[in-house]
Curated annotation (Swiss-Prot):
InterPro entries: Creatin/AminoP/Spt16_N, Creatinase/aminopeptidase-like, Creatinase_N, Pept_M24, Pept_M24_MAP, Peptidase_M24B
Matching SUPFAM superfamilies: Creatinase/aminopeptidase (SSF55920), Creatinase/prolidase N-terminal domain (SSF53092)
Pfam family, one: Peptidase_M24
Name of this protein: Aminopeptidase YpdF
First-level EC class: hydrolase
PANTHER family: AMINOPEPTIDASE, AMINOPEPTIDASE YPDF
Role this protein plays: Hydrolyzes the N-terminal methionine when the next amino acid is alanine, proline or serine. The substrate preference for methionyl aminopeptidase activity is Pro > Ala > Ser. Also able to hydrolyze the Xaa-Pro peptide bond when the first amino acid is alanine, asparagine or methionine.
E.C. code: 3.4.11.-
Cofactor or coenzyme needed: Co(2+); Mn(2+); Ni(2+)
Species in which this protein is naturally found: Escherichia coli (strain K12)
Amino acid sequence: MTLLASLRDWLKAQQLDAVLLSSRQNKQPHLGISTGSGYVVISRESAHILVDSRYYVEVEARAQGYQLHLLDATNTLTTIVNQIIADEQLQTLGFEGQQVSWETAHRWQSELNAKLVSATPDVLRQIKTPEEVEKIRLACGIADRGAEHIRRFIQAGMSEREIAAELEWFMRQQGAEKASFDTIVASGWRGALPHGKASDKIVAAGEFVTLDFGALYQGYCSDMTRTLLVNGEGVSAESHLLFNVYQIVLQAQLAAISAIRPGVRCQQVDDAARRVITEAGYGDYFGHNTGHAIGIEVHEDPRFSPRDTTTLQPGMLLTVEPGIYLPGQGGVRIEDVVLVTPQGAEVLYAMPKTVLLTGEA
């Protein structure tokens, strides 16, 4: 089913005549570019893109099947949308109420000649098109190569910021537009911080270092986490204080991946990982969800959480990222992006998940 066909089915289900899209993430599949500017209006009969002169030429080359409108001082959002409303005799117009300010919503309510209804079309992004899957697969490939590069690069005596800068630079060389979010590098005791962004801390031999990072490629994100052991004289994985914790996290992650298949509820996948960690005695040290959907945004719905009852379907892409965090000692997290297939699940990363030492060829 095409993007417009899916959206029109959604309009019927929501009992709406049309929808006005204003958020970057919901406009991007229509515009072909990522921008906070411009609007998309989709009715049951027509499709419209409204952009100003900065984006008109670029969007014009991509906007097949859409009527393209130039926004300027005369042709405003209100003018153009009201003309569409009049031409098609629209009665109800959905808008992204969760994405716009109260002031904007109030102004639209008074200026647009249709009944405005807050509606959220985010659900339409849960199942990716084959083209979207391919872009995310390529974004994951960049992250995968980045993980192996940074594993060899890291040495004791480097700062976390130096490591993050090298990783982000390498991913850009591989084709990434930029990092898909602020890179996390958390070594030693900072590994107990689930979102420990890279700091000036110096990594030391024998420490675990958790790297959580991703690449943005053609508007789509990857998200990957590996916990590595910083190499040095006498360093041994098996003798590390958190070696057993690492094995528990890995078992939890593999259990969750094994649970992924069409028809399974998201909460069941979360339970598969959480049960392993809880039975090992670390349930109180795993405080976040097991994973989340990924696409145009790093964090999308549905979530692998205890409360999410969404049923998995082929074409969904989600992360699986359990972790254990021990204050004062450190932590371990392992994360993959997983594609739900008709048969089960496909992990989009190739890097091994055993304890790997840094610096080794």
